[in-house]
Swiss-Prot record:
GO-annotated molecular function: antigen binding
Pfam families xrefs: V-set
The keyword Transferase belongs to this UniProt entry's keyword annotation: no
Places the protein is found: Secreted; Cell membrane
Region (Framework-2): 53-69
Residue ranges of coiled coil: none
Region (Framework-3): 78-115
InterPro entries registered for this protein in UniProt: Ig-like_dom, Ig-like_dom_sf, Ig-like_fold, Ig_V-set, IgHV
UniProt protein name: Immunoglobulin heavy variable 1-69-2
Length: 117
């Protein structure tokens, strides 16, 4: 029996109200500690490069925690100190998709992850 802790990463699908703005995220993931996960967020209904894309974590029973952002126009990123060195946020303007990669996963990374613009 595999007694290794597994990390459940849920990805919330978000929809906006401004002119049918939609942010569609990839599905739930189960990973082992130490692994890496990459979550996608495909947008429609607005010009992708006009707004920053943020990523937020919500652990069970906890509030929202901002992880970082990317400027899709130039790829510039800003990360929260807590996630610095473990998170990489990117944007692919050819597909209007943002990505959040979190490495060296820990049990406390079990959470719902949101993209937001």
């Amino acid at each position: 029996m595999d007694c290794t802790w597994r990390i459940l990463l849920l990805v919330a699908a978000a929809t906006g109200t401004h002119a049918e703005v939609q942010l569609v995220q990839s599905g739930a993931e189960v990973k082992k500690p130490g692994a890496t996960v990459k979550i996608s967020c495909k947008v429609s209904g607005y010009t992708f490069t006009d707004y920053y894309m943020h990523w937020v974590q919500q652990a069970p029973g906890k509030g929202l925690e901002w992880m970082g952002l990317v400027d899709p126009e130039d790829g510039e990123t800003i990360y929260a100190e807590k996630f610095q060195g473990r998170v990489t946020i990117t944007a692919d303007t050819s597909t209007d998709t943002a990505y959040m990669e979190l490495s060296s996963l820990r049990s406390e990374d079990t959470a719902v992850y949101y993209c937001a613009t």
